A protein has these predicted regions:
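Conserved non-cysteine loop/helix-boundary elements of the Radical SAM core domain that shape
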Residues: 1-89, 95-114
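Terminal RNA-binding accessory module
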Residues: 105-194
Length: 194
């Protein structure tokens, strides 16, 4: 996904600025063992180009921890890269051996205890970054498509797929309204319909 392609995407008015770019690891050595055909620098450039071309873009990803041979240093590199990119949301999962894959034959499989510990560390970082992203939405005015009632609220999603809750006596379901984001709580933004 080069800069020219991203600029062309940005001209599509109906395109929502939410991009899921699977990272797997933020360490080049680990990516190479995974047989991924990209490096962190290339990935970072794509993210920068998306953020330069799309206002308030949401970048989400998948991260695997405990891949065969992942050293403490490699895990730390992955943590540092993920902090640098500042994802809106991260799906974290531990590596598990898959029969028939080349990784099954790798030496230096990571113990379940280390995988569990690294998963907890990565999940803590993911929660922190998600909270920071949601907080960055406060005071913004966003178009929200309302999808379902939740208790006294109606839940919808902004163009960048941020969950937003509002109170309203009107039937907002299936409709798009401008909403001013006013606060964040429990992984949701709260707002007022304008």
């Amino acid at each position: 996904m080069d800069e020219h392609f991203i600029r062309r995407l940005a001209k599509i008015e109906k395109l929502c600025p939410q991009f899921h770019l699977s990272l797997q690891s933020g360490c080049d050595e680990t990516l190479k063992r995974m047989n991924r055909h990209y490096a962190t620098k290339e990935y970072e450039i794509i993210v920068q180009n998306l953020r330069n071309s799309f206002e308030n873009a949401s970048i989400t990803t998948d991260v695997m921890v405990g891949f065969s041979g992942e050293s403490d240093e490699e895990f730390l590199k992955s943590i540092n890269f993920i902090e640098k990119i500042r994802f809106a949301k991260i799906h974290v999962f531990p590596y598990s051996v898959r029969p028939g894959t080349s990784a099954e034959k790798f030496k230096n499989q990571i113990s379940p205890q280390v995988k569990n510990s690294r998963t907890k560390i990565m999940l803590t970082l993911a929660e922190k970054l998600n909270s920071e992203f949601l907080a960055s939405q406060v005071n913004k005015i966003e178009e929200v498509l309302f999808e379902r009632p939740i208790g006294k609220f109606i839940e919808g999603y902004s163009k960048n797929y941020t969950p937003v809750l509002v109170k309203s006596d009107e039937n907002l379901l299936g409709k798009i309204y401008n909403v001013k984001i006013t606060s964040v709580k429990n992984n949701h933004c709260f707002g007022t319909v304008l």
